[in-house]
């Protein structure tokens, strides 16, 4: 029976980090179903949803702990289940671009939360506007 584990890992950004994590998954017999990976400052963060049987995931939990100890990664894993599809809701995509200021993400999250709107996926970044150099926030 297919079981799932959610894995979160963060560590110093370096070449081969994704390879090392996925090698452990493959060697344990797991399959990456979904992932999000990004550099945040000098750190590299990974989120993965991995499928496998009970034995695969038990072995993976142990091997991830070893990888964390040997490589300086902070690794957290948690067993989970497939998220049931939400047929009672309509999916929306929201794009926001504004001047960057403290609390923008918090305000947007509060707007959605106060209206009972779940956030399924979110990605933000800051940058300087091309012609003016103004600090910008994009969601």
Residue positions per predicted region:
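A conserved regulatory-domain signal marking ACT and ACT-like small-molecule sensing domains
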Residues: 1-139
């Amino acid at each position: 029976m297919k079981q799932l584990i959610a894995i979160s890992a963060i560590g110093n950004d370096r070449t081969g980090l994704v390879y090392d994590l996925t090698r452990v998954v493959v060697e344990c017999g797991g399959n990456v179903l979904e992932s999000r990976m990004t550099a945040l400052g000098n750190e590299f963060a990974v989120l993965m949803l991995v499928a496998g049987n009970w034995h695969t995931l038990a072995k993976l939990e142990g091997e991830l702990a070893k990888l964390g100890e040997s490589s300086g990664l902070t690794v957290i894993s948690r067993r989970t289940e497939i998220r049931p599809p939400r047929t009672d809701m309509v999916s929306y995509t929201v794009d926001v671009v504004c001047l960057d200021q403290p609390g923008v993400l918090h305000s947007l999250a509060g707007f959605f939360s106060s209206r009972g709107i779940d956030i399924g996926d979110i990605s933000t970044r800051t940058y300087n506007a091309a012609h003016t150099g103004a600090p910008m926030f994009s969601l």
